[in-house]
């Protein structure tokens, strides 16, 4: 049975939340065989990104992610979020774009922007 639009967005958000607590479970439950990604800091395989995410979680066990917006079009979901690696820090603004095959994540793109402590923009990053 094909996943619905609403549950695709929920699956993308769930993947990001799980990646902050249980990377292995995030991949087991939500990633498709043959998954590939475009993060420029890691080789393009699922295992390379998964290990990088696991290492980040080991370094920052108090990491928290807050989803700000999710958009969907066809097989694609885009999630804008705010991640704080440690409490009481400005953190990063993130954009993840997921491509789904059925109910699984087949491809992932991501970009991050560090949030300055004293931004001149009164509108904030979100």
Predicted regions and their residues:
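C-terminal and inter-domain tail/linker signature
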Residues: 1-126
